[in-house]
Amino acid sequence: MAAAARVSEVKAEGLLRGACAALAAAAALLVGLSTQTETVLLVRKKATVKDVQALWVLAMAAAAAAGYHLLQLLKCLYLGRVGGARPCRRSSRALAWTCLLLDKACAYTTFATTVAAAQACVVALDGAHAVQWTKLCNIYTRFCEQVAGSLVLGMLAAVGTAVLSAASARNVFRHYSSLETYAAH
C-alpha cells in the first residue's frame, strides 16, 4: 500500500513539474521573442527584451527554471518506472536534500526575477515624471501586453515551484525517524 501511494506521489510530482516546465518555458519564450517596431517622431524604434535588463534576466531565469524542471521530470519518470528498486537510505536522503535545496533556489529565483521585471514594467506603464520618462506602453502596446502575459506565466511557475518545494521538504523529512521511535528506545 505504501509503495502504491509513493508511486502516485511521484506521478503527481511529475505532472506538477511538467506544468511548471511548460509555464516557465512559455514565459521565457513569450518575453524573449517579444519585439515591436514603431515610428516615433519620424524615427523607427524597435522595442526588445534587451531594452530592459530585468526582462532579459527574467527570460534567462525562466529558461533555466524550465530546464531544471525538465531534468527533475526525467527523474520522476525514472523513479516511476523503477519504483520497486530502492537506493540505499543514505544516498536517497542526500538526493532528497539536494532536490529540496534546488527546488527552493528555483522557486526564489523565479519569484524574484518575475517581481523585478514587474517592477521595471511599472515604469514602462506609468512613466517616471521626475526624470521625464514617458509612458512606453502607450507606444508599444503589443510588446507590453506580451510582457504582461509572460509575467503572469512566470508568477504561476513560481507558485508551482513553491508547491514543489513544499513537497520536496515533505520528502526530506520522510527519511528521518519519527519521535515515537526515539521515545521507545
Curated annotation (Swiss-Prot):
Subunit structure: Homodimer and heterodimers.
Family, similarity comment: Belongs to the Casparian strip membrane proteins (CASP) family.
InterPro entries linked: CASP/CASPL, CASP_dom
Major localization class: membrane
Transmembrane segments: 14-34, 54-74, 105-125, 147-167
Keyword rRNA processing set for record: no
GO cellular component: plasma membrane
Protein name: CASP-like protein 2C3
Keyword Nucleus: no
Extracellular side: 35-53, 126-146
Source species: Zea mays (Maize)
